[in-house]
Amino acid sequence: MKQSKLGVLMVNLGTPDAPTPQAVKRYLAEFLSDRRVVDTSPWLWWPLLRGVILPIRSPRVAKLYQSVWMDEGSPLLVYSRRQQKALAERMPEIPVELGMSYGSPNLPDAIDKLLAQGVTKLVVLPLYPQYSCSTSAAVWDAVARILQGYRRLPSISFIRDYAEHPAYISALKQSVEHSFVQHGKPDRLVLSFHGIPKRYAQLGDDYPQRCEDTSRALRAEIALPAEQIMMTYQSRFGREPWLTPYTDETLKSLPSQGVKHIQLICPGFSADCLETLEEIKEQNREIFLHAGGEKFEYIPALNDDKGHIDLLEQLVRDHLSC
């Protein structure tokens, strides 16, 4: 029997090509037009998106991107590229490509590169530790849609998530412990996950449970009393209720409860990006300090840390034999 030619497709959400209103508008238009992300009827949503949201939000969001943009580009893309490079170096016998669900480098090009190299078994690795219909399932949809254009399809191994994987929890633990060594133990350790509308969970998305699974596993490994480790949700958008407790409201309330020193980690983000570097590290830090807090430390995403690359390699190798 002919041996399969293996390939790995790493996928993250995406980013604008530049911190400009025009580039941000293109990116947001693609992102917010995905029915997995916003499931409102297109007849209602698209006029609102194109007529109101994009013209108003694009300049505002562009300024936020400018505040975190790196010399090499968008933080999310920079760190994702580093992850791709590090994983490829671990597995030189297997081609590894990076594609973004929205923006560049795009998924069609990444898949085309892999298939052009003769890949017959494709491992799809969405860089989302906790499954959600709005992220992981959107990757599944996109890959299936792209492959409709090919006559010869590869077999596919899809990594749904890795919320409780021992190597993932170990990497998070190392990050937290490093922060404790640098800054001392805080009054509270906050685990902030990206939120989703409550309605999505009520319709069957198990994302909240997967966030709780990660939090429970991490609590068991951290040298803090369980009651000093909190789980919250950030980045809500729109008017409908999202998962609670909200990160910003929680941080605002903590100083009045005698909590003066917090450290915050975002376990659901595999790479630092606008939501971690600007929303959390800057905006939410100011919220906490303005409310009377005294010390706030943001614990960076796993990015291209060795422990994170160990995890990604183990995930891929586990699925190569499936």
UniProtKB/Swiss-Prot annotation:
Coiled-coil regions, chain positions: none
Reactions this protein catalyses: heme b + 2 H(+) = protoporphyrin IX + Fe(2+)
Annotated binding of Fe cation, by residue: 194, 275
Alphabetical GO biological process terms: heme biosynthetic process
Enzyme Commission identifier(s): 4.98.1.1
Domain of life: Bacteria
A GO-annotated cellular component: cytoplasm
Biological pathway: Porphyrin-containing compound metabolism; protoheme biosynthesis; protoheme from protoporphyrin-IX: step 1/1
Chief location: cytoplasm
Keyword line: Cytoplasm, Heme biosynthesis, Iron, Lyase, Metal-binding, Porphyrin biosynthesis
Group of enzyme by EC: lyase
Pfam families for this protein: Ferrochelatase
GO molecular function, one term: metal ion binding
Cellular location(s): Cytoplasm
InterPro entries: Ferrochelatase, Ferrochelatase_AS, Ferrochelatase_C, Ferrochelatase_N
Function: Catalyzes the ferrous insertion into protoporphyrin IX.
Record family assignment: Belongs to the ferrochelatase family.
Name used for this protein in its record: Ferrochelatase
Higher taxonomy: Bacteria, Pseudomonadati, Pseudomonadota, Gammaproteobacteria, Enterobacterales
